[in-house]
Each structure stands twice: as structure tokens, then as C-alpha cells.
A protein has these predicted regions:
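DEDD superfamily 3′-5′ metal-dependent exonuclease/proofreading module
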Residues: 1-79
Length: 79
């Protein structure tokens, strides 16, 4: 999945739809939150795949390199 720019861009710009970090882009989720999902299991479906991808991005320290792909939302969504 890391080699498909469209999948990567969609995952980076996907907004978390529920929970403590609802409304935050997946790329801006805290790493401990993604580690928790990794240990408990990612949700089924596309969101789970996107969370797993963002987990791998953060695990490998690539989030700064991918920051230019984040589409502006009109407000600062980095809490």
C-alpha cells in the first residue's frame, strides 16, 4: 500500500470518524493511539486498512516526509 500514491494520500487525509480523536486526520493521530489499535486490532474495512497504513508510516518515521500531501482543511486540525 505504501507504493500506491492514491491510497497513501487518501489515508493521510482521511478524518477519524469516532472516538477521542474524532475529526482529526489519521496522519495527525498520536502514535500511542495507533499502537493501541495495533495491539487490540484495527477496525474492519477501509478505515482499518488506513489506520494500519498510518501506523506503519509512523512506525518508520515517515510522517514528516508525507506532510506535504496533507490537504488543508481551513483550520488547524493538529491538536
Amino acid at each position: 500500500m505504501l507504493d500506491d500514491p492514491k491510497v497513501l494520500s487518501e489515508a493521510i487525509n482521511q478524518v477519524m470518524p469516532f472516538g477521542k480523536y474524532a475529526g482529526r486526520k489519521l496522519i495527525h493521530l498520536p502514535e500511542p493511539y495507533l499502537v493501541w489499535f495495533y495491539s487490540k486490532g484495527f477496525p474492519e474495512g477501509k478505515l482499518g486498512q488506513q489506520l494500519a497504513l498510518i501506523y506503519e508510516v509512523k512506525l518508520n518515521g515517515l510522517e514528516k516526509m508525507l506532510e506535504p500531501l496533507v490537504k488543508p482543511t481551513g483550520f488547524n486540525d493538529r491538536f
